[in-house]
């Protein structure tokens, strides 16, 4: 409130989708505030001073410029389990440089983004050596163990669907270098166990010699169905696989990370139900693929669900030997996302491509398409093969400025084109199948929720209830 005579005037700008955490959108806050004040100028003029008095008031508030103090040191307080000194190299504030309040604010955001602190403040504190910049940290009370729960649920009007409960556990700061133990478990249609020990090799994150080593293992069982060209199910198979790896890598600034290491997968197929002839001997044979893996993960999206800005790039390449193949075995996988918004409208462009060299008589293949936004209108995993290409453009609009029970409601549509091939050499833009969907979505605490209608160029139609990321 602004108090005065004869009445009080309430200024209540409509902030729309802006929230208290949108620090980087300060200019928008200012514009909205100015517009709100200008709309009430008539009421506000009752509080105005005469021009001479206002000029005198402004002159009395002017302070002579002073030089910013030069920082003698940077110091951290409040850390018990974590080692915040690891982040010194990525902070913009430096000992020996003049203090910059805006830079210090940016540094608090970088420290908060590490995930270990529930509060980060700063202050200047005099010392015998000079002014010190002190970062006051409050570690998350539930750390250093972090648990997350997610849910994947899908069903269509044919009755096909799946349910998966996802659990993750991260244990931070196992040693002073910031080692982590990362665990994931999936319960449901395709159960999975994953565990990784991640060990940084440097005391300073972001330094020129920064790097890490990671050893990991994964146990997974995946159901795969085979379909005839008309879309009728002909077989149900199960693939069990044990995969492990030893990686060496390094972060690439704030973009993401690169990894290079040894990789091995041991897998076996088994038949559950089949109406067609299958190579029984090959199905029961143990398959091994071992080699060298290169992986690049860059993620600059502003949100995991319904992002409004940014991009993401994932590249994986494996070269090695596989049981039964005389030539070298290869796997190449790539996916890219670019997101741009205009007001409440967002355009999301995605591309995904993959290919592998496998034995010709192995049924299906490791890559599948079919289901919501994976050629909508087809049954889940209806297409399978050894090469895949999918192009998708989605547009969605935020429906509510002040959502209830969710972080936002969205309405949107997608256009999709893609296919899979049994022969990897046939992958290309020719022969792509087209599809599309319209959907209503909500960003919930356990993942994005969709109610959608899908259609495919071959005549496939489906209604989806989908919880999770397509």
Residue ranges and their predicted role:
Residues 27-154, 168, 184-201, 242, ...:
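Periplasmic polypeptide-binding modules associated with outer-membrane biogenesis and secretion
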Residues 1-18, 28-34:
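Conserved catalytic block of serine-dependent lipid acyl chemistry
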Residues 80, 126-128, 340-344, 442-446:
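A generic beta-sheet turn/junction motif
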Residues 102, 107, 116-295, 301, ...:
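Gram-negative/organellar outer-membrane beta-barrel architecture
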Residues 15-17, 25, 454-460:
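A short, acidic, flexible beta-alpha connecting loop/helix-capping segment that sits on the rim
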Residues 113, 119-121, 132, 144-156, ...:
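C-terminal outer-membrane beta-barrel translocator/porin domains of Gram-negative envelope proteins
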Residues 10-13, 412-414, 441, 448-454:
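Conserved active-site loop/cleft motifs that coordinate metal ions or position small ligands
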Residues 427-439:
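A short alpha/beta connector and helix-capping loop motif
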């Amino acid at each position: 409130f602004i108090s005065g005579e004869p009445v009080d005037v309430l200024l209540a700008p409509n902030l729309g989708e802006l929230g208290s955490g949108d620090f980087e959108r300060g200019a928008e806050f200012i514009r909205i505030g100015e517009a709100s004040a200008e709309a009430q100028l008539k009421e506000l003029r009752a509080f105005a001073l005469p021009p001479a008095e206002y000029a005198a008031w402004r002159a009395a508030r002017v302070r002579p410029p002073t030089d910013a103090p030069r920082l003698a040191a940077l110091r951290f307080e409040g850390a018990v389990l974590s080692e915040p000194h690891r982040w010194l190299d990525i902070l913009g504030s430096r000992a020996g440089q003049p203090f910059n309040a805006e830079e210090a604010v940016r540094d608090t955001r970088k420290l908060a983004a590490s995930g270990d602190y529930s509060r980060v403040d700063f202050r200047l504190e005099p010392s015998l050596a000079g002014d010190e910049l002190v970062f006051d940290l409050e570690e998350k009370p539930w750390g250093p163990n972090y648990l997350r729960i997610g849910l994947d649920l899908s069903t269509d009007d044919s009755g096909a669907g799946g349910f998966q409960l996802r659990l993750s556990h991260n244990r931070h700061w196992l040693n002073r270098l910031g080692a982590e133990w990362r665990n994931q478990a999936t319960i449901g249609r395709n159960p999975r166990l994953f565990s990784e020990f991640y060990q940084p090799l440097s005391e300073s994150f972001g330094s020129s010699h920064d790097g890490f080593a990671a050893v990991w293992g994964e146990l997974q069982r995946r159901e795969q169905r085979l379909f005839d060209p008309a879309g009728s199910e002909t077989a149900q198979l199960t693939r069990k696989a044990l995969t492990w790896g030893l990686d060496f890598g390094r972060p690439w600034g704030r973009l993401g990370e690169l990894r290079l290491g040894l990789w091995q997968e041991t897998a076996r197929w088994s038949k559950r139900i089949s109406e067609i002839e299958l190579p029984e001997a090959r199905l029961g044979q143990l398959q091994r693929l071992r080699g060298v893996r290169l992986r690049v993960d860059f993620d600059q999206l502003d949100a995991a669900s319904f992002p409004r800005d940014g991009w993401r790039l994932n590249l994986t390449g494996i070269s090695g030997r596989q049981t039964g193949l005389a030539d070298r075995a290869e796997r190449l996988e790539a996916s890219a996302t670019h997101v741009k918004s205009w007001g409440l409208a967002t355009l999301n462009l995605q591309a995904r491509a993959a290919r592998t060299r496998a034995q010709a008589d192995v049924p299906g293949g490791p890559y599948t398409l079919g289901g919501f936004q994976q050629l909508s209108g087809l049954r889940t995993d209806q297409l399978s093969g050894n090469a895949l290409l999918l192009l998708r453009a989605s547009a969605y609009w935020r429906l509510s400025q002040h959502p209830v029970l969710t972080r936002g409601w969205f309405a949107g549509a997608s256009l999709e084109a893609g296919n899979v091939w049994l022969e990897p050499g046939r992958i290309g833009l020719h022969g792509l199948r087209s599809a599309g969907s319209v959907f209503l979505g909500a960003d919930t605490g356990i993942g994005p929720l969709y109610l959608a209608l899908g259609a495919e160029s071959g005549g496939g139609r489906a209604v989806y209830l989908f919880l999770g990321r397509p």
